[in-house]
């Protein structure tokens, strides 16, 4: 709305079910913009209920139609309501925020003493923005991308259903910059959910399954590369398990 692209009270439409959807629902509620979130019907019921409680209207698409099906639902919602489609998978404001805010915060908080940064990939905005900034200041830092084992689009592998909301869209997002990613680690949904629960019980951190996937990937990285003793995990979202 600051750029004049969103009118007062205009409906906002987005194809998302992850941590961005949560943040967007809160922002729309506070700014009095109706929100329609389009997502596959396979998104956990708990996640759908949580987003509904935050004020979003949920529109579901059959999973077999993939991302195209979700985007079709989003465009139908735009045409029906006159809404504004953010399209954060291709919107450069997404990685730009992380270049300006998240990346600098990480470098400052750690004094640049990092071997690797582990980031889950949904829209690709976080890993791109954080990665580009971090590598500009810390040329030796390794950027590790995390995706679901069941949906390995980033690795060029099979894509299918998984239970890690916010990760693994089933395609390579426009916002994803593969040139700053040093390695990709795939984590099974069951391991991601189990690790998120473990983090809650042991450290009282209510991480989402995507956060569990990131932590699991970091463990694997530090096992495979014991010389990496300073690894930072970017954990997004809150507890909503399958």
Residue ranges and their predicted role:
Residues 71-72, 82, 135-209, 224:
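Active-site/ligand-binding loops adjacent to catalytic centers
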Residues 1-5, 22-34, 53, 131-138, ...:
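Alpha-helix C-terminal capping segments
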